[in-house]
Amino acid sequence: MYIENINGPEDVKKLSEDQLNVLAEEIRDALLKKLSKHGGHFGPNFGMVEATIAMHYVFESPKDKIVYDVSHQSYPHKMLTGRKDAFLYEEHYDDVSGYSNPGESEHDHFTIGHTSTSISLALGLAKARDLKEENGNVIAVIGDGSLSGGEALEGLDYAAELGGNLIIVVNDNDMSIAENHGGLYENLKALRETNGESKCNLFKAMGLDYIYVKEGNKVADLIEAFKQVKDTKKAVVVHINTQKGKGYKLAEEHKEEWHYCAPFDVETGNPLDSFDGEDFSSVTAQYLLKKMKEDKKVVAITSATPTVMGFIEDKRKEAGKQFIDVGIAEETAMAMAAGIAAGGGKPVYGVYSTFVQRTYDQITQDLCIDSNAATIVTFWGSVYGMNDVTHLGLQDIPMMSNIPNLVYLAPTTKEEYLAMLDWSIDQDQYPVAIKLPGGEMISDGKKITKDFSQLNKYEVTEKGSKVAVIGLGTFYNMGCEVAKAVEEKTGTKATVINPYYITGIDEVLLEDLKKDHDVVITLEDGFLEGGFGEKIARFYGDSDMKVFNYGVKKELLDRYDIEELLKKNHLTVQQIVGDLKL
């Protein structure tokens, strides 16, 4: 096997064209084996094998710097830059992350996981090179829908003005995670259909040189193209037409489903661990489709992640014009939601917690200043969510709970969530966000009669004395377990409180606790600093009430073990009760 002898790009350069083609097959075989056992980004990597080989054949990494947008397609790059063992041998599968990582290799220049940043980052590297009067190529690799992100367009806009070497490889597989959206992709389609000759050319209009590679999965053609632009003295776009998922039939035929995969059976493609029950995604789509039929003003919005809201392809078709995918453009999604609300519509924007930060300004400026009554549903904002450092969902409580006018809610069950969502859509006074719990969805069948328009009214679910436990969202059930453990240890029944609201405190209830409680415990699923518990502690700051805040310490975690993280932050029932020293 050639791949076993590849310890760096210098070894790639030793191979003939035929050998490079065999190397591509070996890379795909290794990827198929690893991803079937380990999971990861499938389609993006299978489509970029030949381009990655060609880049490392032509350029001189790490002197020539390659920046992968999102970097979810960087697996072949890692295999060719000294990290092949992490893809060839199961005992080493966890040696590398799923994204570029400077801590792993000098061939990686940034830790990247969010979209549309590569061109701007590459511009910075190119400018630094020129300031130091050095030589070398800087290559930005962007695709999978990332061009629709505002930062990518901003980077393209400035690239022609840079005045030095910059190579932008546009990996055009006609897909985002799902299908692409927006006029930009119509232009890419026109360029594909005319072999790059269309008179309407976005890149040339921005002052960039341009070449087109029709066979973006053909090593020889890619090598020729990259040799043509190597050491260019200006900014140039190399537009390559690739096939997402190339080399695995199921991924070629079902590109959306195979963007990312869990462990699966290679022969059938079926996941090894199937889940047939409800989750918050499927429940969201089911509810919204029903609501859409009842009210034509209801509209669901996504920024290129439709399945997080449960809107798989058939449900998107069912929703029709009442479903909007703006592409990878969170800022536009949020501002558009604010505009729809201002115009009398009822928008619901579903977004991963980790991507909320990409639209923070729009939430503050466009949504909340005028109190436009849009609904935001944040998914996977939890220690039980994604655990890569680039995709943590632990910051949304401090970020969103401190924006004036925003009502941020934290349900603990399916029933509470749907009641909150229904109230939020039908009311027209407040911008509302709903933080979905992490872990498995709990459904207790209870009918929710709470009036959420009475803001910041907590609910005492178990009345006791001495110790009060306020469990927010995901950690409400842990709060119930803590209360039970307190009673078992002391014989005194503890009070349990479901706060519902993240953005405000129930001063009446908290004041009442002073009468017969000495200790208040808060539990929250996210960073402690600037979070929910600190608001409670601040309220009791001038009193004798002892307050224990539990959550996650603010730090950039990467690929953490959930149980270890909980123990590290004293987020276990035994540790919490022990801290009380009862």
Model-derived features: positions:
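Glycine/charged-rich beta-loop-alpha catalytic/anionic-binding loops adjacent to active sites
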Residues: 29-36, 95-111, 133-139, 312-324, ...
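Non-catalytic terminal/interface segments that mediate subunit docking, oligomerization
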Residues: 65, 248-357, 362-372, 465, ...
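Glycine-rich ThDP/TPP pyrophosphate-binding loop and its adjacent helix/strand module
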Residues: 73, 108-264, 268-277, 282-286, ...
